[in-house]
């Protein structure tokens, strides 16, 4: 049997909280936002993050100053494959490791954010088959418009079930929004505008369109925006475009004062949001939460495959007038010319949509989840 070294809880310390949300940024960022909120609520609270060695958490969690405990991943096959036969053994190994972490840090509550890190945490929190273990209360948070398998299982045993939007598929869930880091929710775009534009080499005057398609970029967004570059420049609109580290962008030379700044990725999203007047982006749960939190009008372009959850993520914001949903197949240079450019030139409409976006979001979601966690733990 493998032996693990785990950071243990100091005697006499505050509450011990485990956040379980690894793999993708959509699971990790809400977990870290809640971790930050817990520290703001009570600096004595100990937060431990669960993750796997192959997820983004191996970089993101240490950067934010939290201990990370690794467990074996438990990917849930979507279709019957040979991996389904390996699932029971993988679950047992991961639950055993998670229990070791729970015991070592003397966890008072576990907050799960879905994905293959959360499922072992939910299963390990119980008293076990022989009913000899100390049960740890569980809180489930679902960021997506359609709940995943892990959170559906966790919701059955959870003390509190939270969701980003109504009708997530988790009965009785309390809608709290998506936890977003304070550097975004507290962002003063007006105050940072000049600094942000200087950071990216954008002109002080004139509208700026921000374009990004997630951590890997999006080809359809790249082709549509770059294809309309001459018309954007002619209208005096600058572009800040994160095209993805694996993609290249062919942008024709344009004259005038407007600039087209193309970068592989954006490490300072706070400055990117502050520099922009509108956004063209995908509609992952975290993207929608951040864009609405900062009050930016958006053209949301859901992924054209999967279960359609990206469109559902954007619907509440769009219903309030804070954005538009554009099918991937309809985002073309012509659409940018006919729809995006006129909006960026209409300051009144931009202001109205920005206010609607900010009003539809949940800027205090991280603090609310933190308060619920403390209440459940005690």
UniProtKB/Swiss-Prot annotation:
Catalytic activity, per the record?
Answer: di-trans,octa-cis-undecaprenyl diphospho-N-acetyl-alpha-D-muramoyl-L-alanyl-D-glutamyl-meso-2,6-diaminopimeloyl-D-alanyl-D-alanine + UDP-N-acetyl-alpha-D-glucosamine = di-trans,octa-cis-undecaprenyl diphospho-[N-acetyl-alpha-D-glucosaminyl-(1->4)]-N-acetyl-alpha-D-muramoyl-L-alanyl-D-glutamyl-meso-2,6-diaminopimeloyl-D-alanyl-D-alanine + UDP + H(+)
Q: How does it sit in the membrane?
A: Peripheral membrane protein
- Family, as annotated: Belongs to the glycosyltransferase 28 family. MurG subfamily.
GO biological process per UniProt: carbohydrate metabolic process; cell division; cell wall organization; lipid glycosylation; peptidoglycan biosynthetic process; regulation of cell shape
Top-level taxonomy: Bacteria, Bacillati, Actinomycetota, Actinomycetes, Mycobacteriales
Record HAMAP family: MurG
Cell compartment(s), UniProt: Cell membrane
- InterPro entries named among the record's database cross-references: GlcNAc_MurG, Glyco_trans_28_C, GlycoTrans_28_N
Organism from which the protein derives: Nocardia farcinica (strain IFM 10152)
User: Function of this protein?
Assistant: Cell wall formation. Catalyzes the transfer of a GlcNAc subunit on undecaprenyl-pyrophosphoryl-MurNAc-pentapeptide (lipid intermediate I) to form undecaprenyl-pyrophosphoryl-MurNAc-(pentapeptide)GlcNAc (lipid intermediate II).
Per the record, the pathway is:
Cell wall biogenesis; peptidoglycan biosynthesis
Designated name of the protein: UDP-N-acetylglucosamine--N-acetylmuramyl-(pentapeptide) pyrophosphoryl-undecaprenol N-acetylglucosamine transferase
| Pfam families assigned to the protein according to its UniProt record, in alphabetical order | Glyco_tran_28_C (PF04101), Glyco_transf_28 (PF03033)
Segments crossing the lipid bilayer: none
EC assignment: the record states 2.4.1.227
One term under GO cellular component: plasma membrane
The enzyme class is: transferase
């Amino acid at each position: 049997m493998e032996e693990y070294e785990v950071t243990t809880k100091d005697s006499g310390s505050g509450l011990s909280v485990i956040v379980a949300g690894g793999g993708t940024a959509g699971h990790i960022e809400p977990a870290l936002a809640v971790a930050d909120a817990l520290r703001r609520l009570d600096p004595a609270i100990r937060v431990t993050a669960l993750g796997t060695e192959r997820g983004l958490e191996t970089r993101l969690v240490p950067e934010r100053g939290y201990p990370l405990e690794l467990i074996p991943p438990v990917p849930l096959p979507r279709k019957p494959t040979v991996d389904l036969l390996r699932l029971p053994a993988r679950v047992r190994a991961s639950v055993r490791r998670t229990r070791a972490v729970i015991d070592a840090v003397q966890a008072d509550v576990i907050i799960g954010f879905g994905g293959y890190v959360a499922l072992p945490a939910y299963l390990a929190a119980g008293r076990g088959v022989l009913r000899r273990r100390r049960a740890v209360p569980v809180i489930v948070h679902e960021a997506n418009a359609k709940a995943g398998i892990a959170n559906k299982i966790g919701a059955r045993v959870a003390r509190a079930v939270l969701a980003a939007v109504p009708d997530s598929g988790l009965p009785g869930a309390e809608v709290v929004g998506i936890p977003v880091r304070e550097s975004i929710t507290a962002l003063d775009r007006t105050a940072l505008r000049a600094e942000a534009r200087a950071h990216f080499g954008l002109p002080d005057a004139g509208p700026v369109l921000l374009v990004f398609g997630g951590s890997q970029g999006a080809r359809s967004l790249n082709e549509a925006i770059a294809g309309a570059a001459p018309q954007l420049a002619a209208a005096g609109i600058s572009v800040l475009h994160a095209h993805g580290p694996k993609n290249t962008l062919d942008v024709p030379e344009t004259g005038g004062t407007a600039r087209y700044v193309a970068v592989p990725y954006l490490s300072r999203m706070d400055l990117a949001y502050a520099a922009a007047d509108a956004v063209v982006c995908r509609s992952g749960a975290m993207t929608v939460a951040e864009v609405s939190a900062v009050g930016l009008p958006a053209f949301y372009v859901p992924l054209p495959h999967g279960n359609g959850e990206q469109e559902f993520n954007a619907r509440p914001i769009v219903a309030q007038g804070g954005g538009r949903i554009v099918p991937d197949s309809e985002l073309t240079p012509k659409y940018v010319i006919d729809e995006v450019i006129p909006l960026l030139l209409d300051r009144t409409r931009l202001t109205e949509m920005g206010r609607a976006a900010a009003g539809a979001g949940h800027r205090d979601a991280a603090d609310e989840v933190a308060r619920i966690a403390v209440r459940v733990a005690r």
